[in-house]
Design a protein with these regions (language model features):
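Conserved SAM-binding loop
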Residues: 120
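Extended, histidine- and acidic-residue-enriched regions that form the cofactor-binding/catalytic faces
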Residues: 1-117, 125-273
């Protein structure tokens, strides 16, 4: 079904337009948009990794919310700016301008429906800047619109406790954490018999304190597998622990956003030259 991991009663498109029009306190109702990508994740994981993670985490967070916290999920936006993986079959992408315009149009739709709190939870590392640009544009247009562009992993979670020091520093794609959480969310899509480990070359400390590549890159630059990290230590139990910790943090985050009273302005935005 379209709602995937989100419970039907928390899924915005399952309401009629009259239901949405009649919702109380829409100014403090949190609308959640999971944003992912369809792109290669090595030979052992499906191309839908990012879409699965953001839909799974946020869907389960919405399911775990206290009943008194008003929040609804939108269908996940599964296509993203994935051109760093363009050399691999299965990567289905849109360009940055298309994604930016799509995000702005969706935000305008959320605002037009009367909602004033929009949480964008992205899981693909190649597009946070696009989410931020869309959020800023919407805020310029609407001074009472609280738009929060976020990253699904950038809340308190236990993933790092399972990783080696090298994995924490250099893993970026299809490594330990993503493999483990897929074992919990979609175990039938994980094929560890095909897994490989692969790390990028370390960057000079003067330009990157943790050694992570600071220059522009594509996944093909680091080898033929598409993997950037070590998936081998991942286990289903670790994946469930990571998932549970992310869900708990996002329940807290959605609740706090519901209560947040962000500054608002009512003047028209100035015209840009």
């Amino acid at each position: 079904m379209l709602h995937a991991y989100t419970p039907p009663h928390r899924f915005l498109p399952y309401l009629s337009w009259t239901d949405i029009a009649a919702l109380p306190d829409k100014a403090n109702t949190v609308i959640v948009l999971p944003v992912g990508a369809i792109e290669q994740h090595g030979p052992h994981l499906p191309c839908a990794v990012d879409a699965i993670i953001t839909a799974g985490v946020m869907g389960q967070a919405l399911a775990a919310l206290p009943a008194e916290v008003p929040a609804f999920g939108m269908p996940a936006l599964v296509y993203g700016k994935s051109d760093e993986h363009i050399h691999f079959p299965g990567t289905l992408l849109v360009d940055g301008v298309t994604l930016l315009n799509t995000m702005i149009a969706l935000g305008e739709s959320v605002y037009r429906a009367g909602f004033r709190k929009w949480l964008i939870v992205n899981s693909h590392g190649g597009q946070p800047q696009v989410m931020e640009m869309a959020a800023r544009e919407l805020r310029i247009r609407h001074g009472d619109f609280t738009v929060l562009p976020h990253f699904v992993w950038r809340v308190s979670n236990v993933a790092g406790s399972f990783m080696t020091e090298r994995e924490r520093r250099l893993s970026m794609h299809a490594g330990h954490a993503e493999t483990a959480i897929l074992m919990a969310l979609a175990p039938d899509t994980v094929h560890m018999e095909r897994a490989v480990a692969n790390y990028p070359p370390e960057f000079p400390k003067s330009l990157s304190t943790d050694g992570r590549p600071a220059a522009a890159w594509t996944a093909r630059d680091f080898g033929d597998s598409g993997v950037i990290g070590d998936p081998f230590p991942a286990t289903p139990a670790q994946g469930q622990a990571i998932l549970d910790s992310l869900v708990a943090s996002w329940v807290e985050g959605i609740t706090d956003l519901h209560h947040l009273q962000w500054p608002a302005r009512d003047e028209a935005p100035p015209r840009l030259a």
